[in-house]
Every structure is written in structure tokens, then in C-alpha cells.
């Protein structure tokens, strides 16, 4: 058979034998590697199965309780969103707002109400919110720290004095009756006060008051109070 093969010599036969030997060695090495891989994969599968067996198994009652809690949480979540949609009073032709759209509308609504409250005057009645009472207490504490006692207002002028009487501090006021006025010492100067039993009428004339005692001469001096003082 080798004789009929054209172009093959001793060199060709040697190369063919070497190729066969290399192929046999590579096949044997591949078989050994395959066996190693198979054993390692089996070991890993056994370890994974062992870990799964070591994990504590949950009972059916615990799984049912967890499912009930999850359903209740989702139900409360949906009820809260439905209440928020009703508070916003949206009108989409029977359609329901999505959760993201509901939250966005709620944010815009709260912002608008905050602006209205800041622009409106202070309420005339006490507020019943605990947050407002806390803010009021803080405001009062800060206000007391910066509060200063106001200065006492000047004493009011005697009610019997009119604007005409106190117009000029240099001229003593004119009493309606020289003998009946409680502030007779604030009458005219000495020139007019020395006239006995006379009182000035509305027309500027002087007359004597009925039943009035004679008026003594009154001396006037300049005082530190409301102009002239009786001496």
C-alpha cells in the first residue's frame, strides 16, 4: 500500500508518525482535562445543593402573613392617593390621575395656598393648630427679649382748657367765669383780673356773675408750667 503512494519517502513517513503521536497525546490530555472539569462541576453542584439544604425553610403560615401585610400596605397606599385626588378636586372626564401627576398637583396646590396665607393679613381669632401655637410661643420669647419699656406719655392737659386757651403759652387762658371756674388762677393777667365781679360774655363784654363774691386783685407771675401762675 505504501508502494503505490506517490511522492512519499522516509521523511514523509516520519512526519506522519509524529503527527499521529501528537494527536494521541493531545486526545489523552483532553480526556484528562474533561474528567477534571466534570468532577469540579459535580463538586460545585453538590456544594450548591448543600447550601440550599442548609437555608432555613419558611413555613406556609409565615408566607401567608407576609402576603397579607403586603396587600394591606398596597391598599393603604392606594387609599391615601385616592384621598389626595379627592382633595385636589381634579376633573379629567372620569379618568384617574396617575400617582406622579397627583403628587405634582399637590405640590402646586400647597405652594399656592402658602402664597395666599403670606399675602393675607393676620387672623383676628386664635388658631387651633399645634404648629401655630409653637411658632407663636417662639415669636413671643424672641419678642420679650427685644422688648423695651415705652416711655410714659406726658400728662394730659386739664379738660377745662380749650384750644384757644392753650394756643399761646405766653398768654394765660381765659376762664368762662372768674369766680366759678376751678382754674381761676389761670385767668387773664392782672389788668383784667383786678376788675371786680365781672365775667366775659360770648360777645367779648364783661358782666358780673350772679351771686359771685367780689374778686380780689390777683397777681400773676411767669412759671415753668402752663404760662402764668397765680401767686
Swiss-Prot record:
Keywords from UniProt, A to Z, are: Developmental protein, DNA-binding, Nucleus, Transcription, Transcription regulation
Q: Name one GO cellular component term.
A: cytoplasm
Where in the cell does this protein reside? Nucleus
Polar residues bias: start-end ranges: 137-149
Q: Could you list the residue ranges that cross the membrane?
A: none
* One example of a Gene Ontology biological process annotation: regulation of transcription by RNA polymerase II
Name the Gene Ontology molecular function terms of this record. Answer: DNA binding; protein heterodimerization activity
The segment(s) forming the bHLH domain are 61-113
InterPro entries per the record? bHLH_dom (IPR011598), E-box_TF_Regulators (IPR050283), HLH_DNA-bd_sf (IPR036638)
Where do the segments described as Disordered lie? 135-168
Query: Would I find rRNA-binding among this entry's keywords?
Result: no
Task: Tell me the SMART domains matching this sequence.
Answer: HLH
> Which PANTHER family does the record cross-reference, listed alphabetically?
BASIC HELIX-LOOP-HELIX TRANSCRIPTION FACTOR, TWIST (PTHR23349), CLASS A BASIC HELIX-LOOP-HELIX PROTEIN 9 (PTHR23349:SF10)
What does the UniProt function comment say about this protein?
A: Transcription factor, which play a role in limb development. Is an essential player in the regulatory network governing transcription of genes implicated in limb morphogenesis.
Q: Summarize subunit and interaction data from the UniProt record for this chain.
A: Heterodimer. Efficient DNA binding requires dimerization with another bHLH protein. Interacts with TCF3, TCF4, and TCF12.
What is the name attached to this protein's record? Answer: Class A basic helix-loop-helix protein 9
Taxonomy of the source species? Eukaryota, Metazoa, Chordata, Craniata, Vertebrata
Q: Which gene encodes it?
A: Bhlha9
